[in-house]
Amino acid sequence: MSLDEATIQFLKQLGEAGVRPLHEMTPEEARALGGMLGDMYGPGPEMARVEEALIQAEDGGSFGARVLVPAGTPRGVIVYYHGGGWVIGAIDEFDTLGRTLAHRTGCTVVLADYRLAPEHRYPTAGSDAYAALTWAAASLPGLPIVVAGDSAGGNLSAVVALRARDEDGPPIALQVLVYPVTDCDLDNASYTDPENQLMLTRDTMIWFWDHYAPDQADRARPDASPLRAKDLAGLPPAVVLTAEHDVLRDEGEAYAERLRQAGVPVEAKRCAGQMHAFFTMVNVLPGSAAAITTVVEAIDGVLR
C-alpha cells in the first residue's frame, strides 16, 4: 500500500518549508525541529493533576519526569519513553500523546525525560529508563505497570523489560513497542527500500547510532540491540506496532516473532500506509488515532 494521503500532504508541507534531513543538522538544531513539530499536536485532554518529578539516576545524576493523572481512580501506570534516536525529543513534545493515553486508559502516565546523547551516551538512556520504572513502582505503588515507547523509546521499553526480568525488578503487565529500534543492523530490507526513506532514513539512523553508541561492540549488546538477546522467554506480554514505510519495520517485526517463539503473548500489527513517527502525530495524521486505539485496547485487556 502506498502512503496515505494525509502523510503525503504532511511531507509536502515539510518539503515546502525547506526542512533539512536530521543527519545534516547538529543535535541542537534537530532538537529545535522536534519542538516545532510538537507544537502542532494541540494541548491534549485536561488532567486532574500534572506533577513534575525529579528522578535520581543510577550514576548519581538525575533527570525529570512528568506525571499525568487523569480524572477518577487510576487503573494503572504507563511509563512512557519518547522517541528521538536517543538524541532528540523532550517530554513537552510528547505531552499531548501522554495526556491522550492517560485520558483513554484511565492510567497515570509518567513521561520519562531521560538524558540524551551525545552528552550522555550509551548506556545512560537505558539506565535512566530503568530508574524511571523503579521510581514509578515505588512512587505509585499497588498499580499494574505498562512500559511503552516509540522508536528509541520502544527500544528502551524492550531493554527495561529484559532488565526487570533478569534482575527480578518491578513486574510489568505489558510492554508496548511502537516501531521500536531493536537491532544495530542497518542493511536489512526495510532499511534499503527507497520507499522507506521518509521521516526517518538510513542516514539519519546512522547519525543517531553514531551519537548514542559509537562503539560497534556496544551497539551489539542486548541493552542496545534487544533483538540480539539470547533468551526472550519470561518477558511480559507485548504489543508491537510497525509502520509499513519505515526503515525500522523489519527489526520490529523480527523482535515480535522472536518473542512469539519464546512463548511470550504478542499482538503485532503492521500499520498500512504509515511512515515512521506517525503514532505521536496526534491530531495531525489520522493513522495516529487508529494506532492509539490499538494500544488503548491492549492496555484495557491487561487491566481488566
What residue spans do the PLM features occupy?
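Hydrolase active-site cap/lid region
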Residues: 162, 166-217
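Short beta-strand/loop motif that positions the catalytic acidic residue
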Residues: 240-242
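Gly/Ala-rich beta-loop-alpha elbow adjacent to hydrolase catalytic centers
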Residues: 149, 153, 157
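Catalytic nucleophile-loop/oxyanion-hole region of alpha/beta-hydrolase
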Residues: 90-91, 97, 110-144, 282-288
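A glycine/proline-hinged amphipathic helix-loop "lid/cap" segment
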Residues: 1-67, 304
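The serine-hydrolase catalytic nucleophile loop
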Residues: 85-99, 251
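Catalytic active-site module of serine/aspartate enzymes centered on a nucleophile-bearing elbow/loop
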Residues: 285-304
